[in-house]
UniProtKB/Swiss-Prot annotation:
Organism of derivation: Mus musculus
PTM sites of type Phosphoserine: S10, S159
Protein name, as recorded: Core-binding factor subunit beta
GN (gene name): Cbfb
MF terms in GO: DNA binding; transcription coactivator activity
Compartments it resides in: Nucleus
Family: Belongs to the CBF-beta family.
UniProt keywords, alphabetically: Nucleus, Phosphoprotein
């Protein structure tokens, strides 16, 4: 099953969901809402250093669980995210974040910043052209492999049917659909 839709760019540019989230808008950290604000600040900073966080787009209520690593790290042993993905040094009191993902079958990058004290900020989705091309190539390979396996199955099925038909042609006994009695034995 492919992880992406056939025309990712078109879906990103034309679907209302993506159009709304591709404009920079207000975001909030949504983790540990039941905890005191100071504890949430600490937990948010620790989560960022670990390469993950939960945010919500305020205007739409869309919640995302983000991972701040290159897309190629999916499923591999993770380390501390690089400054490209979690930048605590660019501006005092803020963290700049970047999270590549596949969202609704489209390769995107979430980019934004969050104020370390208020736990809110601004963010948006961008179309990830490079990853989209990679995923399209993987989907095409999977499609070609499935097509090859289907052809092999159909070829085996056809030769089996031809073999069975040849056996029927050789067996002159009326009402027999199979060959001789030996064909009925389990092998």
């Amino acid at each position: 099953m492919p992880r992406v839709v056939p025309d990712q760019r078109s879906k990103f540019e034309n679907e209302e969901f993506f159009r709304k989230l591709s404009r920079e808008c207000e975001i909030k950290y949504t983790g540990f809402r039941d905890r005191p604000h100071e504890e949430r600040q600490t937990r948010f900073q620790n989560a960022c250093r670990d390469g993950r966080s939960e945010i919500a787009f305020v205007a739409t209520g869309t919640n995302l669980s983000l991972q701040f690593f290159p897309a190629s790290w999916q499923g591999e042993q993770r380390q501390t995210p690089s400054r490209e993905y979690v930048d605590l040094e660019r501006e005092a009191g803020k963290v700049y974040l970047k999270a590549p993902m596949i969202l609704n079958g489209v390769c995107v990058i979430w980019k934004g910043w969050i104020d370390l004290h208020r736990l809110d900020g601004m963010g948006c989705l961008e179309f990830d052209e490079e990853r989209a091309q990679q995923e399209d190539a993987l989907a095409q390979q999977a499609f070609e492999e499935a097509r090859r396996r289907t052809r092999e199955f159909e070829d085996r099925d056809r030769s089996h049917r031809e073999e069975m038909e040849a056996r029927r042609q050789q067996d002159p006994s009326p009402g027999s659909n199979l060959g001789g009695g030996d064909d009925l034995k389990l092998r």
